[in-house]
Amino acid sequence: MAKITKTFQYGKHTVTLETGEIARQAGGAVIVKFDDTVLLVSAVAAKSAREGQDFFPLTCDYQEKFYAGGRIPGGFFKREGRATEKETLISRLIDRPIRPLFPEDYKNEVQIIATVMSLNPEIDGDIPALIGASAALSLAGTPFKGPIAAAKVGYKDGEYILNPTVSELKESQLELVVAGTANAVLMVESEAALLSEDVMLGAVTFGHREMQKVINAINELTVEAGTKPSTWEAPAKNTALISAVQEAVGPRLGEAFQVRDKLQRRDAISAIKKDVVESLAGRVAAEGWNPAELSKEFGELEYSTMRNSVLDTKVRIDGRALDTVRPIAVKTSVLPRTHGSSLFTRGETQAIVTITLGTARDGQVIDAVSGEYKENFLFHYNFPPYSVGETGRMMGPKRREIGHGRLAKRGVLAVMPSLESFPYTIRVVSEITESNGSSSMASVCGSSLALMDAGVPVKAPVAGIAMGLVKEGDRFVVLSDILGDEDHLGDMDFKVAGTAEGISALQMDIKIEGITEEIMKQALQQAKAGRLHILGEMAHGLTAPREELSDYAPRLLTIKIHPDKIREVIGKGGSTIQAITKETGTQIDIQDDGTIVIASVNAIAAQAAKARIEQITSDVEPGRIYEGKVAKIMDFGAFVTILPGKDGLVHVSQISSDRVEKVGDVLKEGDVVKVKVLEVDKQGRIRLSMKAVEEGEGASAE
């Protein structure tokens, strides 16, 4: 196939899609050029599903190569290793809008690989990767109901910005990624500076409107490439099996869904399924039915039973109304030796959140393609198997945990103090101890309380809520504070975090082929009411940060010295700074601009270290009297240390008003004496006098 190219303007950027020259053995492959950021995105689908495959095995891998930024990776092996947090998050970002656009019965393995091969530091790889994934899938001839497109939206001075650069995002009040088809939105991911619901909805519609040119370009590329439509057909429904399962279940599933307790409800449904399997075992064998199909049909019946019930009755499976939030309980200072902690419980979802305060050196150094930087606000989310009453392997964080942690971090980021005003590295850890839906939003609420408990000067309390949707045709209901089953059996997971003032984070994932602006508007308004209710409940714990830090948290003292004096504080081979830290028990960080941060749990020790540094960096003042220690005796006088690292000479003629024949007769090394500074010459040599002090001249040094 000859090389085919499509070029269009997308905001301020020129975008080019190329296919037919590179990776020609892949099902579909596209080079995406977004100005100087260049990605190769491939899509390959297996010819058939594996035997017994009962889920859609879609894998999305986003990878950034260090050569893209003209850098060599660090570490011993000098090559890219396991996926970074950023790569994991963008891999999830690609997966989320693509997965719902494959047919329910399609079980062939599909893999999308997006590789950043050239990186302009001003243009991130997320939007090009999403565009490339959509184009590659469209070219691969899969039963993909796309194409989709994506846009990044910023907001400044009341205006939306399409695909802002990295520099523009630093000044923006919003960073929002929206993806969707020509007709509907499928996914939203955002971080905001406490913006209103109307501004957020406007950003989504703005992004969706602007992305139409991308969809048109992909359609044109696919036509010119002569891509053949997919020949895959969904397997025929086994109507006899479906009728048999429905008859065997009867009204029992509807009754099971009335059980309020999650574990009891699961047990009741499992008992019904077991009975159905046993009662139909003979017929399954006689008819040659696949047992996996029976299990699948039972799941379909679960799905329709719950959905029809809530649509018809407007009552949910735990008895709540559509907009009711589960009971909330909050506690703070639950762990005595942590710097801050909270216990947040909402129904059967629970999180213990802890705060640890450290110094700037405790920040995480990240070796990125665009350059090395340090992260001083860390948010870690852990989801152990016991939280849902299961067993499982305890390994490193999975993709889901990394994604949920990032969302919760976005939720509180807007209220965090700047590093200049609160120079601590802050680590938040959310341990999910129970889960029945919305654990990431429980982490937002719990972290807000724990941060205030730690005395971190956050601007306002933050709460989060997860919304759901059940939609059949023109009928739909929006659910507040969804359960795990409502998430699993519903059509939308819509999470909103924010303060009483506005939204700080919004994430939306749609399992159907998009939702309308009307549904989004209702969900946002319902989420606001729920968020305000939760904030009211959280106020029973704390409403503002504590005035004092924990007794176990480090106290930070910040002083500023002239950069030229840094080497005096460090000393030869680090001797001076090591002596101060050892003798005072403090931790000292020195920055290139002369900022010195002293950390110590003991405030007195921190003050002592500060005094030592001020002594070292202070200038010797002519005419001032100092108390010093005799450092060395010479025939012509004595050297006296008046400040750390600063020695001056008391000439034999300046020791006393009386005649001194031999210096050693009057002074010995280690003697403490008062001296007056007579002169500091151009070479920095200091002339001192004891005689002048005797004669009562000069001012006494403090």
UniProtKB/Swiss-Prot annotation:
Annotated S1 motif domain residues: 623-691
UniProt protein name: Polyribonucleotide nucleotidyltransferase
Alphabetized InterPro entries for the sequence: ExoRNase_PH_dom1, ExoRNase_PH_dom2, ExoRNase_PH_dom2_sf, KH_dom, KH_dom_type_1, KH_dom_type_1_sf, NA-bd_OB-fold, PNPase
Highest taxon, organism lineage: Bacteria
Family recorded in the similarity comment: Belongs to the polyribonucleotide nucleotidyltransferase family.
Residues at which Mg(2+) binds: D487, D493
Chain ranges of the KH domain: 554-613
Entries under Pfam families matching the protein: KH_1 (PF00013), PNPase (PF03726), RNase_PH (PF01138), RNase_PH_C (PF03725), S1 (PF00575)
Reactions catalysed, as given in the entry: RNA(n+1) + phosphate = RNA(n) + a ribonucleoside 5'-diphosphate
Gene Ontology process terms (BP): mRNA catabolic process; RNA processing
Claim: Transferase is one of the keywords in the record: yes
Self-association and partners: Component of the RNA degradosome, which is a multiprotein complex involved in RNA processing and mRNA degradation.
Enzyme class, UniProt record, top EC level: transferase
Annotated PANTHER family: POLYRIBONUCLEOTIDE NUCLEOTIDYLTRANSFERASE, POLYRIBONUCLEOTIDE NUCLEOTIDYLTRANSFERASE 1, MITOCHONDRIAL
Phylogenetic classification of the source organism: Bacteria, Pseudomonadati, Pseudomonadota, Gammaproteobacteria, Lysobacterales
Species in which this protein is naturally found: Stenotrophomonas maltophilia (strain R551-3)
